[in-house]
Amino acid sequence: MTPDEVRRTRATVVGGARSGRAAARLLAKVGGEVFLTEQDAPSDGAAAALDEAGVEYEFGGHTAEALDADVLVLSPGVPTQSNIVQQALRAGLDVYSEIEAASWFCDAPIVAITGTNGKTTTTSLTGHVFRTAFADTLGREAIVAGNIGYPFSDYVLETEPTDVVVLEVSSFQLDHVETFRPRVSVLLNITPDHLGRYDHDFEAYAQAKHNIFRNQGEGDVVVYNRDDDDVRNAAEEAAAEQGVRPMAITREGVPAAGAGFRDGRIVLRTDDEDDSLMPQDELALRGRHNMYNSLAAAVSARVMEVENDVIRESLSGFEGVPHRLEEVHTVDDVLYVNDSKATNVNAVWYALESFDRPIVLIAGGRDKGNDYTDLKPLVRDQVRAVVALGESAEKVERELGGEAPDHSRAETMEDALTQAQRAAQPGDVVLLSPACSSFDMYENYEERGDTFRRLVETLL
């Protein structure tokens, strides 16, 4: 949809959280007639901000006025299955995601990054590379936004053609895209998660992820994990059918185009020549999964003409992301690590694989239908004790506790940390990596991680 078309359109934004409010403000600012509808009560200051932006609104439920529109724009938290979206679809209204709507106004090339795990770290790292590259370039910016916590709609009108936008995009944000076209798309991995949103259909979830390259064509690039079968098949099919330039990342050798490893070094191959970028052990981020994340950032930057020395400096100097294998403190020769963002089994697998010393694992929360089978060998090999926490404590202790020499159950994070400290020996790691959502005890995974961090600091 063009800006002129938006100005002639009445749009209803569904969802009054941060991204929904940002979309409403954006559409109003460019001259659209905008109505926002939200099922729940407004958060503090939300109504006043919408008044200031000239947005009409309703909170506490959806009325018929919400469907008096030409288009619906959905906040990421609003599922397609919701009644209002289904009514809109039956009425023949066009339905778009917030990312789609914001992209209508973007003048800069977009590097869009998705995957079940690793997308926030990769987005932050890629943004760090571009910001380092542009540090001495007047008037050129790297804008990092999307699912990382900064709605695209809040920043898109600031973009210039010389900028680069680095977007973290979730499967929810990739639902209902029609024209969203990144210059570079990155697909890291796909494993079961959020399946309740997709009627427990993994293929539907995977298809949402594939939407990241749905509209790409000649001149665009897809960066994909060659070691993930679903990712490889989908990306290579899109590249062949749509004329997109494929760039693979892999831990198994060096691909024909993309990045991999040879003799302990990262090797880039983006222009039919090998560039030996840097030793693998100089990467700032630990763990197998972060090898993929680092490769993805390197390739994305290189195809956008960032020089190798900048990429090398950025990959070795990056300080990481809170709540993602965040090293909090070492106390009595025990390292305490906050991996609260690990809300699925696959993320915990990566976390356990990242350490070569014994681990005391704190896991549990609100269960997402987890199957712990794949974790059991790693727990047997690497975990000294399992401390089970939250609603799923009984299941975690039953499924994983018996695989470790010791296990226990905790009612609170403070209790969990006390038990973990008691079980740990010098040289060990105490790892909060829950495999579950936080909503049984906390507002979000950030609050859970902040609580863990604060409690660790009391041990000093």
Curated annotation (Swiss-Prot):
Main location, first listed in the record: cytoplasm
Instruction: Could you list this entry's UniProt keywords, alphabetically sorted.
Output: ATP-binding, Cell cycle, Cell division, Cell shape, Cell wall biogenesis/degradation, Cytoplasm, Ligase, Nucleotide-binding, Peptidoglycan synthesis
Where it sits in the cell: the answer is: Cytoplasm
Q: What is its EC number?
A: 6.3.2.9
Where is it found, in Gene Ontology cellular component terms? cytoplasm
Task: Give the GO terms filed under biological process for this record.
Answer: cell division; cell wall organization; peptidoglycan biosynthetic process; regulation of cell shape
Q: Name the residues that bind ATP.
A: G115, T116, N117, G118, K119, T120, T121
The record's annotation in InterPro entries points to: Mur-like_cat_sf (IPR036565), Mur_ligase_C (IPR004101), Mur_ligase_C_dom_sf (IPR036615), Mur_ligase_cen (IPR013221), MurD (IPR005762)
* Gene Ontology terms for molecular function: ATP binding; UDP-N-acetylmuramoylalanine-D-glutamate ligase activity
Please state the pathway this protein functions in, per its UniProt record.
Answer: Cell wall biogenesis; peptidoglycan biosynthesis
Report the leader peptide range: none
Q: Please indicate if the UniProt record lists Kinase as a keyword.
A: no
Substrates-to-products reaction catalysed = UDP-N-acetyl-alpha-D-muramoyl-L-alanine + D-glutamate + ATP = UDP-N-acetyl-alpha-D-muramoyl-L-alanyl-D-glutamate + ADP + phosphate + H(+)
Q: Which family does the similarity line name? A: Belongs to the MurCDEF family.
Record's function text: Cell wall formation. Catalyzes the addition of glutamate to the nucleotide precursor UDP-N-acetylmuramoyl-L-alanine (UMA).
Among NCBIfam families, the record links this protein to:
murD (TIGR01087)
The name on file for this protein is UDP-N-acetylmuramoylalanine--D-glutamate ligase
- Origin organism is Salinibacter ruber (strain DSM 13855 / M31)
Which lineage is the organism of this entry classified under, starting from the top rank?
A: Bacteria, Pseudomonadati, Rhodothermota, Rhodothermia, Rhodothermales
